[in-house]
Amino acid sequence: MESHSKIFGHPGHTLLITFPLGLLSTAVIFDTLALLTHKPKMAEQGLAMTGAGILGGLVAAPFGTWDWLFIPKGTRAKNIGRVHGLGNVAVLGLFGASWALRRSDPGKMGGLPFALSVLGFSLAGLTGWLGGEMVDRLGVGVDDGANLDAPSSLSGLPTAESAE
C-alpha cells in the first residue's frame, strides 16, 4: 500500500520519525548521565532533547495518521496501526510529563521524571517495532510494484515499469 504523504518520493512519516526517535533516545542517555554524575548540564541537555523530540513527534504524527486513514478497515494493518498510533500518543505523553516536571529546575534530574522518560523510551521501542511490522511485513507505505531494480524515487517513473 503506497504512502499518501510523500516527501521527495518517500513516506513522510518514515523520514520524519527518525528525528524524535533519535532526540528522545539521546534525552534518555543525557538523563542517565545526569543521575549518575549529578552534573546540571547533563540534565539541561536531556530536557532540551526531550522538548525537541516531543516537537519532532508532533510533526511526524500527522503524516502517519494520514497514511493510516487509507488502510482498509478490518485489516491486520489497520489494527496494528491503531495500536502503533495510540502507543505513540502515550510515548509523547510520558516524555511530555517528564519535561513538564523538570521545566522549573532544568539542571536537576529527579527520579519520577527519569522513570517517565525510561518508560516512554521502552514504549517507543514497542511502537517502533509495530511500525516496522506495518512496513516490512504488511507493506504499508511501500510503493506498489516495488522491486530490487526500481528506478529512483526522484526519477518520476513508477516502480512497476522496472518489474519486468
Enumerate the predicted regions with their spans.
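Short amphipathic, positively biased membrane-proximal segments
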Residues: 1-164
